[in-house]
Design a protein with these regions (language model features):
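Structural preference for beta-strand elements that scaffold enzyme active sites
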Residues: 31, 87-88, 108-110, 145-151, ...
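Histidine-rich, glycine-flanked metal-binding segment
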Residues: 1-27
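Alpha-helical scaffold segments that flank or form the walls of functional sites
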Residues: 25, 43-107, 128-143
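Active-site glycine- and acidic-residue-rich loops that bind
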Residues: 151-167
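Active-site beta-loop-alpha junctions enriched in small/polar residues
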Residues: 36, 94, 114-118, 151-155, ...
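Divalent metal-coordination and catalytic microenvironments
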Residues: 23, 34, 85, 102, ...
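Active-site gating loops and adjacent loop-to-helix segments of metal-dependent hydrolytic enzymes
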Residues: 41-72, 110-113, 185-234
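Histidine-centered catalytic micro-motifs
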Residues: 29-40, 176-185
Length: 241
């Protein structure tokens, strides 16, 4: 590595091959700090609707994809990122498709294994599955390029105890954490007031054995809500929205 004018560097390193790119500017690769590569194939299907409607529809459509679909979609998303100059991504995935895809494409990435459960009785089981996946994914990737972490599901799909469990495990195992707390005012209203389409959706989908109503208002902001449950106790926490 060296710095200088083209003429100076050519004199210093006469045996090195040189390339002339004309007026092009050479930049380091861009970094995208929040992706869901496995959902790339769903782009453009749902648009011009409120956030709550959009995200819930996207989750329902994503559930129709199988493992092969998720992998192909993650490859597509990775290729589109590379074509835009993005060489590093921070990706949240439940399937692990982006872990395999970024490894195969030679990208740098931090892959966060999503973990969530609305029912308190399912939290420990969900964490156990996530921990097993995390250890397995670590063995499958080049650790110099790909780092594995954890991400609690969005607040409308996650029991608050999950935040504490993730933070405790992350601190113990020194893994990064990604949080999604307030994607839109509707999500903020869900946390503070117990209202918005998210509360209705939680009852309609009957996730687990959650009592009705499945969510009680907290009277605080999503950030303070997560703070109260210890979500920021680990050493490497990224909040994407």
């Amino acid at each position: 590595r060296d710095v200088g004018t083209a003429a100076m560097l050519k004199l210093r390193y006469p045996d090195e091959e040189t390339s002339d790119y004309g007026q092009a500017a050479l930049l380091p690769g861009f970094v995208d700090l929040h992706t869901h590569l496995e959902n790339a194939v769903l782009r453009g299907i749902v648009h011009d609707v409120p956030y709550a409607t959009w995200i819930m529809t996207m989750r329902e459509l994503s559930a129709k994809l199988d493992v092969a679909d998720w992998y192909d979609s993650a490859i597509l998303g990775g290729l589109e990122a590379l074509s835009s100059g993005i060489t590093t991504v921070a990706d949240i995935t439940a399937s692990g498709a982006s872990c395999t895809a970024t490894q195969k494409l030679g990208m740098r990435s931090v892959i966060y294994r999503e973990v969530g459960a609305m029912d308190r009785r399912r939290v420990d089981f969900a964490m156990h599955q996530a921990e097993n996946d995390l250890m397995h994914w670590r063995e499958e990737v080049d650790s110099s390029r790909v780092t594995i972490g954890l991400s609690p599901s969005a607040v409308f799909a996650c029991h608050p105890e999950m935040f504490r469990k993730v933070a405790q495990f992350a601190k113990k195992e020194n893994v990064p954490v990604a949080l999604r707390l307030a994607g839109d005012r509707e999500e903020c209203d869900f946390v503070r007031y117990g209202s918005s389409p998210f509360s209705v959706h939680s009852m309609d989908t009957k996730r687990g054995f959650v009592e009705i109503p499945p969510w009680l208002p907290t009277g605080t902001t999503p950030v303070n809500y997560a703070l109260n449950w210890g979500a920021f106790e680990s050493d490497n926490v990224m909040m994407v929205h």
